[in-house]
Amino acid sequence: MTSKDETPDQEVYAFNADISQLLSLIINAFYSNKEIFLRELISNASDALEKIRYEAIKDPKQIEDQPDYYIRLYADKNNNTLTIEDSGIGMTKADLVNNLGTIAKSGTRAFMEALQAGSDMSMIGQFGVGFYSAYLVADKVTVVSKNNADDQYVWESTASGHFTVKKDDSHEPLKRGTRLILHLKEDQTEYLEERRLKELVKKHSEFISFPISLSVEKTQETEVTDDEAELDEDKKPEEEKPKDDKVEDVTDEKVTDVTDEEEKKEEKKKKKRKVTNVTREWEMLNKQKPIWMRLPSEVTNEEYAAFYKNLTNDWEDHLAVKHFSVEGQLEFKALLFVPRRAPFDMFESRKKKNNIKLYVRRVFIMDDCEELIPEWLSFVKGVVDSEDLPLNISRETLQQNKILKVIRKNLVKKCLELFNELTEKKEDFKKFYEQFSKNLKLGIHEDNANRSKIAELLRFETTKSGDELVSLKEYVDRMKSDQKYVYYITGESKQSVASSPFLETLRARDYEVLYMTDPIDEYAVQQIKEFEGKKLKCCTKEGLDLDEGEDEKKSFEALKEEMEPLCKHIKEVLHDKVEKVVCGTRFTDSPCALVTSEFGWSANMERIMKAQALRDSSITSYMLSKKIMEINPRHSIMKELKTRAANDKTDKTVKDLVWLLYDTALLTSGFNLDEPTQFGNRIYRMIKLGLSLDDEEHVEEDSSMPPLDEPVVDSKMEEVD
């Protein structure tokens, strides 16, 4: 029920009950994100301009009086008011009464319920009541509006339960449109500052289709001489000027006695001073246009570069760009950029998870929506502008929104397309891979749906590539006809893996081996079971499974049987340090090495996990499976050791040699020593043996060293206060 009290000047109306309750909530509750009021009011102004533009298409006469489309902001610090004016369609008297007070929108009650349930205040526009966000910062709102079909009217309210509407004869006339005057609360004067208003427009409304201008003060200093002051003196009334009869009697000769030189001196004596002039002018705030709304063929590289720098504040140009639109059941446009270099804090846990700004119909919504793009693509920067998402959708709703999931899927697809396009430009892809290879490998680990596509982008150095990087496809294409697996080795550096004993037989067979020296490779390769039908095989783990001829197999079986006693003896000496000791075929020059089980950690992975400060000790103990010592039965050291062990199993030298072989194998296989001191002592004993020195001989004490002083019982040092 609407009550109306008429006076000669104005008509007073009561707010609808739901609107009164909403205003009470807005005014009395505390909201930290009050800044959204400006976004809502600018969005409303933009909607009004869209309406008149649509009307003008049907009837051009609608914009005859005011052909310009604009949104203007004016901050008046003297009167503590912020004015938002637009040249939109405007409102009639009936519109002011109905839309701003007496007829509750269908979403009013729903929004209040959501607000009371703890939802974000920024949702207000979703329910069609964005205008009332003005009361977040204002205790009084004046709306002056002029529609082509009516006179100019003014609506005013302090949100105290009623509002007034009257024909306007006190404000500056509008040709068409609406002027909102916000009388700001005492604690909200920050919204009168030019810097703050510019910041909010850039953040929320930079890509509104219509020009947004702010009235700004411009200060200009100019230099003037004292002539102006003298001119002022001349303008004084005659009676104020001193009269002197003698001066009047001076002859013309005395006046003309002033020479040109004296005139010049007088000119020099004139003092100059600076005068400050303060003027106001309109400064356009949204000069950067939403270039994603244009066709990619219409946008130049220079425009993309300028937009990228404005969007990201990057001082360098982007490396690659993808500009596309999706149409059909779902409509959105997107512009994605790949930077030239990775940020130094890219993998910081507290860092923002993505750099994609989400817009709904050119209005900024948020830039921290973690569901918009997966974490492994967090380096990609850009904008997504949806036509289908509701304006000001809450974060909670956004996470469950089906539209967002479709957008995410399309963004990942387009990013992969962009990366594949980069592979065609060798130098650009090389720069990209240097900066973002870790992200791709993280994608292998996390993105099951796109794993095979990401794997195509991976590049590695190999035993045959020199300093060049090789893709998995290139590797598979040049595999030997008898090669069953894609072989790889993991390690700390290229230098360490290139000299690994595990490569000896593979090199002898002319098999290419991938070098995986990035710590994240260990995680990624666990997820890549095969590539183009070829399984990946780590050459530091058991089960290398090399094809051998019948003669080779028989020869190896004979050697294996011959070395069986030595294998047992080594196992007895090392006890639980190794799970078993076996003969192997993976070495040509090395006597032995330590391999791990097929499903356990490699030496490199063990090193990485031990470096984790917050690792799970239970998982560590489980995954640290016992090592397998694999010996080369054809090596001379092993043959001699077999002979000596057969002659005397208690020989201390043999035992020392076994331990020395084990410790050396730890190092050459990429593990850390369990007991470095013991290893050092064994080396020293071997040195003594080589020098024919007595192992039991002790180091002589240095007789030149003075004896130790007797311990001082009573300290003679002065006590320090």
Swiss-Prot record:
HAMAP family: HSP90. This is Heat shock protein 90. It comes from Theileria parva (East coast fever infection agent). Belongs to the heat shock protein 90 family. Residues 219-273, 697-721 are annotated as: Disordered. The TPR repeat-binding motif mediates interaction with TPR repeat-containing proteins. A motif (TPR repeat-binding) lies at residues 717-721. Homodimer. Keywords: ATP-binding, Chaperone, Cytoplasm, Nucleotide-binding, Stress response. It is found in: Cytoplasm. ATP binds at N44, D86, K105, F131, R395.
